[in-house]
Amino acid sequence: MTELKAKGPRAPHVAGGPPSPEVGSPLLCRPAVGPFPGSQTSDTLPEVSAIPISLDGLLFPRPCQGQDPSDEKTQDQQSLSDVEGAYSRAEAKRGAGGSSSSPPEKDSGLLDSVLDTLLAPSGPGQSQPSPPACEVTSSWCLFGPELPEDPPAAPATQGVLSPLMSRSGGKAGDSSGTAAAHKVLPRGLSPSRQLLLPASGSPHWSGAPVKPSPQPAAVEVEEEDGSESEDSAGPLLKGKPRALGGAAAGGGAAAVPPGVAAGGVALVPKEDSRFSAPRVALVEQDAPMAPGRSPLATTVMDFIHVPILPLNHALLAARTRQLLEDESYDGGAGAASAFAPPRSSPSASSTPVAVGDFPDCAYPPDAEPKDDAYPLYSDFQPPALKIKEEEEGAEASTRSPRSYLVAGANPAAFPDFPLGPPPPLPPRAPPTRAGEAAVTAAPASASVSSASSSGSTLECILYKAQGAPPQQGPFAPPPXKAPGVSGCLLPRDGLPSTSASAAAAAAGAAPALYPALGLNGLPQLGYQAAVLKEGLPQVYPPYLNYLRPDSEASQSPQYSFESLPQKICLICGDEASGCHYGVLTCGSCKVFFKRAMEGQHNYLCAGRNDCIVDKIRRKNCPACRLRKCCQAGMVLGGRKFKKFNKVRVVRALDAVALPQPVGIPNESQALSQRFTFSPGQDIQLIPPLINLLMSIEPDVIYAGHDNTKPDTSSSLLTSLNQLGERQLLSVVKWSKSLPGFRNLHIDDQITLIQYSWMSLMVFGLGWRSYKHVSGQMLYFAPDLILNEQRMKESSFYSLCLTMWQIPQEFVKLQVSQEEFLCMKVLLLLNTIPLEGLRSQTQFEEMRSSYIRELIKAIGLRQKGVVSSSQRFYQLTKLLDNLHDLVKQLHLYCLNTFIQSRALSVEFPEMMSEVIAAQLPKILAGMVKPLLFHKK
């Protein structure tokens, strides 16, 4: 009992201040209770009497002990006997280790520590939280592994380890080993049994604060099933967070909210690996985050990062335009709901972040972006305008954006899906690596989906519909897409359009992004084409004459007479009666040409030599009519040939399609050859394929420009866009009649037209300027001719100078019509995707055939191998140089398209589709130009 005399050297209590636990803690018990009633001095009793003391639930809490403290004296004696037993064992161990401290000093320090811990003051008015009441089930592990565990001698209590080991310091007589044991975590506990310490200095002592230990601000609690052993290190490591100590222990400890351990440590469930969405820490402190998280990710917004756009430049252009759209994109969640379907992520509720701009695109800083973090192609774009995804081959540095596919649905098997708003997506599966998402769809689905997703209007025009009435059934005919619903992939800034969508918008009609086009009640997909080629004659009425069902695409003959121009006069457009003077003409133009050539009339045009010659106005200007006859190739020497014979032409086309050596014409070619005559030259034979190219050459197209009003930049650009729309339609019609082009896959046909439409237009501009005005002006159309003065007054003078180079090259090289026609076809075939075409073999055969035709056309004028080779080099070099020239036009066109609202420039529908879908790819180098010569 001599240990109580060691209390004398303690620091005296300050009068008027709060009671010091180091001074009064040994006597904080009721008088005449306990085994030491006679050792209490009289001078310390007044101190104790002024302090409210509550020992209930502190020394031996009911939830942990399971016994009723009715006999307080018995309990106190049992508790102190247990402590003395623990002390005696510790003394024996440490005495054997050769401790330098004297036994009385060690005895005093050990018992002081135990009593100070067990008899700490408690009460409802206490300002600082007391240590938790429960203790571990093992023995009093106060000094590390030196104490052997003795479960029968220890109280059967559980809970968080007492903050005794975080005490700042003891009295001066304590040994160094004891002080060290108060500061560090006992090494006797295994890492799985080490319980949480307070994150700051111990709140139970009024001494010097202890440096906070680097504990995590959020602790992941791993839930496990099964019962716990009695000697477990504490239930907090297993199971759900719960209140510590129960209700009985609440009187001795500060109130702790559920899920928060002692010291303000938050307990959060471990993040489920099935959910890829990032979680946000429930407690945001300056302390380091839990292991595995970035130290910077301490706030809610640190987990939200702007998604890294892949190097798919078509996506880059679409995303850039969406960010520039003020009205529809800056609206936050409202704008996002208009473009993306609602998410149903299981972790959405745990991340209440109002960031509608980037749904499910956030990822932790220390992790890689999810493969499916960019659902732009199928989530927010209109179905008819989805960009055809292009892989860059084995060396692709980015993962292609993949759309979310409903499990079990094959987009290739449902061509007639209703196009309503996309359904909510199922819960996201674990992220897959690049290439795994492509396995979910069948290999054949890629061809059909890409065909229906790129160039819907072009697909309408390439397939001529029969106008069959829809099938009758118990339901009404499904609603069809409005004729003028905008087909623009990039959401431009509400620019006016010449299509019917502008009139609908002006009338106040609500813009519907996904008009219903469902058939047969099939499930819907967000990226199916908005054009149903069969059973819907009301789709695209302006292009109805150019549609046809798919059944006609797989006819057995390689070339059919229906694919050729019908019997239409190439001069006036009337019904042709046969091939007269080498050209398919009507009887009226035949007689006119014969009389004009034999009578040697000198006709003069009252206008500008650009009069319209058609069935009604063919007699208005004989000069322009005769000029058109000569341009078509009519000569008097060709009258000896028989009338147009369908069988002969089909046989000739089949012969041309087969690989043949140059200069060895067969019988079919000889029968279908015709003469051409020009001053100073002999009569020469024209190859049949070139003759056919002449017959299918489109007529001059008018721009509809009003020359009575002063020119403005917006009016000129709008007129050029309208002209470009008509010329694009003419290119599609021309390509349909092109021998060999219909043998290609429909996707390849659309791709080739989209890649080469600008080259064909500027090449035709150069030819018209060369033929009509000798390259002195830019002959866009008969009603839109720009001289140098008008070029300077326009806002695209530098662009006009660029386009002016082509007619000047024509003048320099004196290009013939036969050479021009062959070069024009090669321009259609000079750009392909990086991965190639679906029907690559047929494409290469077709291109080789037209290269041979160009050699034949060169041989019509050039005599000798050397001169023909030089000519071939000059013409093919001109084709190669067009790539760089057209790239400047592409860039200007895309910039004008993006700024169309600010510039007040209108873009028609089909032209908008092509610009938005393919120009970003072309400018980004995602296409492969086919060059004749190396640079």
From Swiss-Prot:
Stretches for region Mediates transcriptional transrepression: 165-305
Keyword list, A-Z: Cytoplasm, DNA-binding, Isopeptide bond, Lipid-binding, Lipoprotein, Metal-binding, Nucleus, Palmitate, Phosphoprotein, Receptor, Steroid-binding, Transcription, Transcription regulation, Ubl conjugation, Zinc, Zinc-finger
Gene Ontology molecular function, alphabetical: nuclear steroid receptor activity; sequence-specific double-stranded DNA binding; steroid binding; zinc ion binding
PTM (free text): Phosphorylated on multiple serine sites. Several of these sites are hormone-dependent. Phosphorylation on Ser-294 is highly hormone-dependent and modulates ubiquitination and sumoylation on Lys-388. Phosphorylation on Ser-102 and Ser-345 also requires induction by hormone. Basal phosphorylation on Ser-81, Ser-162, Ser-190 and Ser-400 is increased in response to progesterone and can be phosphorylated in vitro by the CDK2-A1 complex. Increased levels of phosphorylation on Ser-400 also in the presence of EGF, heregulin, IGF, PMA and FBS. Sumoylation is hormone-dependent and represses transcriptional activity. Sumoylation on all three sites is enhanced by PIAS3. Desumoylated by SENP1. Sumoylation on Lys-388, the main site of sumoylation, is repressed by ubiquitination on the same site, and modulated by phosphorylation at Ser-294.
Sites of Phosphoserine modification: S20, S81, S130, S162, S190, S213, S294, S345, S400, S678
Cross-link Glycyl lysine isopeptide (Lys-Gly) (interchain with G-Cter in SUMO), sequence positions: K388, K533
DNA-binding region (UniProt annotation): 569-641
Region span, AF3: 1-164
Region: AF2, residue numbers: 689-935
Residue ranges of the region described as Disordered: 1-254, 331-378, 418-438
Biased composition (Low complexity): 232-246, 335-350
Compositional bias (Pro residues): 418-430
InterPro entries: NHR-like_dom_sf, Nucl_hrmn_rcpt_lig-bd, Nuclear_hormone_rcpt_NR3, Nuclear_hrmn_rcpt, Progest_rcpt, Znf_hrmn_rcpt, Znf_NHR/GATA
Region (AF1): 456-548
Motif (LXXL motif 1) on chain: 55-59
Residue ranges of every copy of the NR LBD domain listed in the record: 681-915
Region (Modulating, Pro-Rich): 1-568
Chief location: nucleus
Zinc finger map (NR C4-type): 569-589, 605-629
Domain remark from Swiss-Prot or TrEMBL: Composed of three domains: a modulating N-terminal domain, a DNA-binding domain and a C-terminal ligand-binding domain.
Family from the record: Belongs to the nuclear hormone receptor family.
Protein name: Progesterone receptor
Source organism phylogeny: Eukaryota, Metazoa, Chordata, Craniata, Vertebrata
Name of the gene encoding the protein in the UniProt record: PGR
